[in-house]
Regions:
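ATP-binding glycine-rich loop module of kinase domains
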Residues: 73-139
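Conserved structural core of kinase catalytic domains
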Residues: 141-182
Length: 305
């Protein structure tokens, strides 16, 4: 596990498409120190080797997974009822005081003691979700599955969610080729249709709030549910904000590969969203046909060394 902090404000640093560090909070940019670069490359290589081994089915998946988790860190929490929760985690990310831990079978979100109401707001955002009676695409799997809440001894609150197999934060994968950004875009267009059906503005669609499985092309809008706006003050302007954010995300994840994208894809990403998510999805379908030659499963290249 690695955690790179901004020397200016203490926020979590991200890695851009050119391999430099930047801070989402204060905008500071910097380069890796030699020791940080070695640590980052080793960690990333371990993750990608594990994913490659699973994908190619040429290696013992169990041993690959054990190798991956051999370098995991451990964090412990004392609960108010006198129990201890100890978790091994591969990755952590802090955003606006909320720390997310990627464990083997779960994803944990820890809210600060002085802001525990944010945990309740987070869950309230999820409770606003509703799905069509005939959910033929099983879209419920594109959203977090809540497992439990734990009140901690120090006043913090821990929320636990299910982590499906081989699901990782999108930010972990760096710059992606256009065909991979496109399948992520397809999943997010589906997700935005659910948000509109539920009359929700999410407000936080970005590389750390979206988790993906690169083998099944599955995506989950996991994070930032406390930023949702409910059906009581919902308008079509709100759904267009969701659609603008997914366009910004697609451009971000392509990074240095953006110049390789079909012109139809780039034109769509730079265009204003349609009046609603359903019309926007229809427009996106035309981009898939005209820009990529139709829908097909593209094996994700995991060689990001």
């Amino acid at each position: 596990m690695i955690s790179l902090k901004c020397k200016n404000c203490g926020g979590e640093m991200s890695v851009d498409g050119s391999g430099n560090l930047y801070c989402d909070y204060c905008g500071t940019k910097s380069a890796f120190r030699d020791d940080e670069l070695i640590q980052y490359k080793n960690f990333r290589l371990q993750v990608l080797n594990y994913l490659r081994g699973v994908h190619d089915k040429k290696a013992d998946g169990t041993s690959h997974e054990e190798l991956l988790w051999a370098n995991a860190e451990t964090v412990s929490f004392a609960t108010k009822d006198g129990n201890d929760i100890t978790v091994r985690y591969l990755y952590s990310h802090e955003e606006e005081g909320v720390t997310t831990y990627l464990a083997r079978n779960s994803i944990l979100c820890v809210f600060p003691a002085q802001e525990i109401d944010r945990a309740a707001i987070w869950l309230s955002g999820l409770e606003l979700l509703s799905f069509p009676p005939a959910d033929v695409k099983n879209l419920q799997e594109c959203f977090p599955k809540f497992l439990g809440r734990y009140d901690l001894e120090d006043g913090r609150v821990l929320l636990s969610f299910e982590r499906p197999d081989n699901v990782f934060p999108l930010s972990m994968f760096g710059s992606l080729a256009p065909e991979h950004a496109a399948w992520i875009m397809s999943r997010l267009e589906n997700i935005c249709c659910v948000l509109e059906y539920s009359q929700i503005q999410h407000g936080g669609i970005h590389a750390d709030s979206v988790f993906i499985n690169p083998f099944t092309h599955h995506a989950i809008l996991f994070g930032d549910w406390e930023t949702t706006r409910s059906r009581f003050n919902y308008s079509l302007h709100d759904t267009r904000k969701n659609l603008r954010q997914l366009r910004e995300l697609a451009l971000h994840v392509m990074g240095m590969h953006v110049g390789e994208a079909p012109k139809e894809f780039l034109a769509f990403l730079k265009s204003e969203p349609a009046e609603n998510a359903y019309q926007d999805f229809e427009r996106w379908d035309r981009v898939i046909e005209d820009g990529f030659g139709g829908r097909r499963f593209a094996k994700m290249d995991l060689d990001f060394e």
